[in-house]
Amino acid sequence: IPILLDFYNDDNQISTVMHPILRDVAAAVGDKGKVIKINVDKNNELAEALRIKMLPTLMIYKSGEMVWRQSGEQDADTLINLIKEFI
């Protein structure tokens, strides 16, 4: 199952804009994928380990391997299609 990780914080305007987009993505992929939001302020060590420099940063993991990574705003259709590639 592909997992989309969204690294964000509440002070970042683009991160806030992404919240409803990620809800749409989660609804579209259903049980064939997962969307997990990670607040970098509460998970600082993880953010540092993954070298999160820009918010939001989105990653897709499949079978424990990172298969895609992008920083900045993405639209729902792009994210849905990316996740479907890894189903």
Predicted regions and their residues:
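Structural micro-motif
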Residues: 3, 50-59
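Non-catalytic, surface beta->alpha helical segment in thiol-disulfide oxidoreductase systems
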Residues: 54, 60-87
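Conserved phosphotransfer microenvironments
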Residues: 15-16
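Thiol-based oxidoreductase modules, predominantly thioredoxin-like and allied folds used
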Residues: 7-9, 19, 23-26, 30-45
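Short pre-active-site segment immediately N-terminal to redox-active cysteine/selenocysteine motifs
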Residues: 1, 8-11, 54
